């Protein structure tokens, strides 16, 4: 009897010890530098804001916050590599609707949305269609005239498994155009391609194209949004203004490995939220041209879930 009771007592003590250790690990996390991986090109909006955020990591985490880049296949390489991480990892990764709603439909990927937990949204961005001034296209009506010439149109986008690629293909398909999506390893490269005349059009972030449009190096055609884009540079109709439901707002959010303890997810959320609310960081974001849009993980998941149907409808058009 004593042996039986002793065994139970030992088991309970061991179990309580494991709970205590696990609880302590959650409380002490992070115990090493925290890294946020950007799965897209160096110099792009996501990379710039990630590097800016890293400057304020130490005061929030008590550990250095590092910015890293892993490139390839529009983000799929980094996201696939990230699935090797264990729950409670010190590495996080950026992603968005392109990573999870579009990529699995346009290419074979070795990861699932369920492999990740959204932590916090960093920014949201409207895409615009821009062109080289030589095309003389500056609106949907003039784009229709250009398409009517029957020429095969080349459109630069950040990869093929991206919101840019999907929206471009959807719009040009619905307009009856002959088109080809030309993928690049980043939004900057896609924009450079249209400015140089390597391609006819590019779909990119409105904020990224703004200075080039202002300088006359590129012409803005239409905003991929449900409302007009009007500011000190743009005065653009939306695709919805012309009857096309071919739009998605780009999101850039931070994710961590599924199975991570909620306490660690919460710690990341609060630390990153504090960084994003720092006035110095907000000024940097403004200088970059980023519209910070802080949302919790539940809101990020809800948005990505909502894009699944639209992505499924248009994904086969990316060619």
Language-model region placement:
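Hinge/capping helix and adjacent helix->loop/strand transition within the periplasmic-binding protein
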Residues: 32, 81-90, 97, 104-189, ...
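N-terminal (or domain-start) structured segment
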Residues: 26-115, 151, 160, 164, ...
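Glycine-rich beta-alpha junction loops
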Residues: 98, 159, 205-208, 224-228, ...
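Extracellular/periplasmic bilobal clamshell ligand-binding domains
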Residues: 296-319
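Short beta-strand->loop
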Residues: 112-122, 178-182, 200, 211-247
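Mature extracytoplasmic/periplasmic domains
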Residues: 273, 277, 282-303
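N-terminal signal peptide c-region/cleavage motif recognized by signal peptidases
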Residues: 20-22
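Bacterial N-terminal signal peptides that target proteins for export
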Residues: 1-12
């Amino acid at each position: 009897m004593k042996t039986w009771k002793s065994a139970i007592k030992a088991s309970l003590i061991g179990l309580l010890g494991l709970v205590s250790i696990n609880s302590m690990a959650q409380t002490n996390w992070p115990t090493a530098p925290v890294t946020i991986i950007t799965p897209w090109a160096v110099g792009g909006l996501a990379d710039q804001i990630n590097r800016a955020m890293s400057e304020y990591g130490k005061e929030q985490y008590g550990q250095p916050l590092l910015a890293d880049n892993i490139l390839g296949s529009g983000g799929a390489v980094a996201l696939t590599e990230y699935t090797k991480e264990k729950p409670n990892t010190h590495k996080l990764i950026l992603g968005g609707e392109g990573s999870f709603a579009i990529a699995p439909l346009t290419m074979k990927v070795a990861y699932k949305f369920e492999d990740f937990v959204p932590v916090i949204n960093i920014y949201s961005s409207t895409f615009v269609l821009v062109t080289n001034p030589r095309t003389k296209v500056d609106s949907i009506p003039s784009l229709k005239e250009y398409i009517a010439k029957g020429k095969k149109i080349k459109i630069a986008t950040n990869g093929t498994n991206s919101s840019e690629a999907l929206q471009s293909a959807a719009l040009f398909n619905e307009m009856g155009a002959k088109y080809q999506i030309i993928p690049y390893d980043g939004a900057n490269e896609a924009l450079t391609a249209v400015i140089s005349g390597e391609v006819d059009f590019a779909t990119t972030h409105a904020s990224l194209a703004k200075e080039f449009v202002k300088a006359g190096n590129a012409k803005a055609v239409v905003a991929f949004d449900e409302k007009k884009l009007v500011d000190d540079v743009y005065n653009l109709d939306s695709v919805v203004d012309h009857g096309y439901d071919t739009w998605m707002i780009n999101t850039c959010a931070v994710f961590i490995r599924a199975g991570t303890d909620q306490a660690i997810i919460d710690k990341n959320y609060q630390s990153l939220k504090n960084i994003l609310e720092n006035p110095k960081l907000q000024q940097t974001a403004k200088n970059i041209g980023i519209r910070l849009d802080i949302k919790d993980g539940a809101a990020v998941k809800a948005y990505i879930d909502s894009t699944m149907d639209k992505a499924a409808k248009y994904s086969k058009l990316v060619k």
